[in-house]
Regions:
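Accessory RNA-recognition modules of RNA-modification enzymes
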Residues: 1-217
Length: 217
């Protein structure tokens, strides 16, 4: 069952010198990437975004960032979706080596945005795209971080709702990745408190500490 509201997909190859892949690390391998089209923990729209993005960059022969040689461009595609309204936040993460490989980054990013917006218009796409971002990351390690971030389209956040509370989630927000599971945990905690020895009234407040934005780490 699809439950994830955030995924960090990695660009790479499925085997040494193989074709471009976009997905998750294969079990037991730091370098080999498995394209996860049709993955059960994400929805169908996610797979459409993944497939379209892979085809876009494969067709233009844009190389992935090699983590041993520290050469290449494409690093990650970070996708978030709100369960409350179905909106997506899509963040393309690359190195800054575009010129080295002869690419016009501005032109290519504009084409990338146009491709995603055309995908959004298709009958098969059920959700909507709230924002598309571009992040530069020249860190040597295999971590998604931002040296510079640019908003390419729309807004730089999505909104989520848990038990009547609304949250604004930015590209690098720390937020529980299973919205439904988080809601169940809060309902259980609230139930235990209400049935326990400590009764809450209008003058009492429950604090959820040490958990990022306050939605269970």
């Amino acid at each position: 069952t699809a439950y994830r509201n955030k995924m960090e997909f990695t660009f790479g190859d499925a085997y040494k010198d193989g074709p471009l892949a976009l997905g998750l690390h294969q079990k037991g391998s730091f370098y080999d990437i498995l394209t996860v089209d049709g993955c059960e923990i994400i929805g169908a729209d996610w797979s459409r975004i993944l497939t379209a993005t892979l085809a876009f960059f494969s067709g233009r022969n844009v190389p992935f960032f090699h983590r041993m040689r520290h050469e290449g461009i494409l690093r990650n595609l970070v996708v978030r979706q709100s369960r409350a309204n179905g909106q997506f936040l899509i963040n393309l993460v690359t190195s800054t080596q575009w010129v080295t490989y002869g690419f016009d980054v501005k032109q290519l990013l504009q084409a990338f945005v146009e491709m995603l917006l055309e995908l959004e218009k298709s009958d098969a796409f059920a959700g909507s795209i709230a924002g598309i971002l571009y992040t530069e990351n020249d860190a040597l390690g295999d971590v998604v971080q931002s040296d510079r971030m640019e908003l390419l389209y729309g807004q730089d956040y999505i909104e989520e709702e848990i038990l009547g509370l609304k949250f604004k989630i930015s590209p690098f927000s720390f937020f529980q990745t299973n919205t439904g599971g988080c809601e169940v945990l809060y309902e259980k905690a609230r139930d235990y408190i209400m049935r326990g020895s400590v009764k809450l009234d209008g003058d009492k407040t429950v604090f959820d500490l040490y958990s990022g934005t306050g939605t269970i780490a």
